[in-house]
Amino acid sequence: MIDFTLTKKQQELKEGLNQLGRYVIRPMSLEMDKKKDVPETFLRNFMKLSHSFRSEDVNEFTDAAATVNKVRDPSKPSQSNRTAAIGAEELAWADAAMLLCIPGPGLGGPPVRATGTPEQKERFLGMFANMEETELKWGAYGLTEPGAGSDVAAIRTSCRKDGDHWILNGRKCYITNGARAIWTVIFATVDPALGRAGHRTFVVEKGTPGFEIGKIEEKLGLRANETAELVLEDCRVPDANLLGGEEAYASRAGGFMTAMKTFDNTRPLVGAMAVGIGRAAYEYARDFVKENYVLSRPIPRYAAIAERLAKIGRRLEAARSLVYRATYLADMSIPNAKEASMAKAAAGQAAIWACIEAIEICGAHGSLQTEHALLEKWFRDIKVYDIFEGTGNIQRIVISKRILTDLKAF
């Protein structure tokens, strides 16, 4: 039986991040969006704060603790994924772009933890475990290409063996923190004709000859977080950076499964972020109604608005429950691909709908761009949550495949 009750540490984390978001992050949110950057001073102070709350759960959320180098014993239940989801929701409630800027291995962390050799985990994750309080380092995850987004098996970035190195050629696009990452997990193929069986995964370090930063994208939302193009031209990567070593690719889909397993961990967190943005819009619309409508008047006059608020709240609560279920399964080391996709798809759609409804409830006020009315910004930020890490259509395909291959799924 799943218990959704928060532990004392989780409740403290939730309340602390909510206060930080309300009084520190929210007031600078629109300015960060306009300048397309999060001040380094804030990020350094945030890292100091995370170090001052040295607990296993908070370290798991910031992804900067020594424990990230260890493979967790599957027989010992954890709450780290759920704790990360709780933190992600609260920080996305404040500003989702800022959340994506928090130093750490980011999306690059899960594949290194899941399939890296002990030496690779020590080397690449250790860079963050030993990070000083005011030190800023990022990792990144390079999967998407101009011609291969949702269709992961269609990647065309090539890799070929050359002595004790690999030569990589290709382009990666829409890479979160790609320009400032100290290393990026890059997916490539030895032969496109092999499909997923030809995939290989590398950790490519910043400064590697042939590894360059392309353009920084101009975006609809999440503008304070950079999204970059990465270019590999005869990029020489040592054998030691082949994730998991040669033996990891003995199966026909080793590299492909690395990508899929990453999504099983990260999609629930994307769902949690979407819930945070949707909740922000919902609460703003709710408070707007309280302040601007005389609700003591006959109910029929305001029933339509009240009903809309009720539907928003209901959908967001349902989405959060799916997120918690997916993270519970991850913490128990139980396969959760179906539940991760359900959580991500439901949360993204619920939050997009919540932002649209909130703007309509607030009328013209909802379309304003002011530091006190962030609905316009949240509306721009939320759309990508139904796109990245697998579009809504892809999530439905994943869900349907799991249901049809396991008729006892429900």
Q: Where are the predicted features?
A:
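Amphipathic, small/basic residue-rich leader segments at the start of a protein or domain
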Residues: 1-102, 123, 134, 403-410
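Glycine-rich phosphate/cofactor-binding loops in nucleotide/flavin-utilizing enzymes
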Residues: 2-3, 87, 107, 119, ...
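Glycine-rich beta->alpha junctions and the first turn(s) of the following alpha-helix
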Residues: 2-13, 76, 212-317, 385, ...
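C-terminal helix-coil-helix/basic helical segment that borders enzyme active sites and/or dimer interfaces
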Residues: 26-37, 286, 290-297, 313-346, ...
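N-terminal glycine-rich flavin-associated loop
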Residues: 85, 96-119, 149
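FAD-binding glycine-rich core of flavoenzymes that anchor FAD
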Residues: 94, 114-143, 161-164
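Hydrophobic, small-residue-rich alpha-helical packing segments that form membrane-like cores
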Residues: 145-155, 161, 166, 173-177, ...
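A short core secondary-structure module
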Residues: 169-213
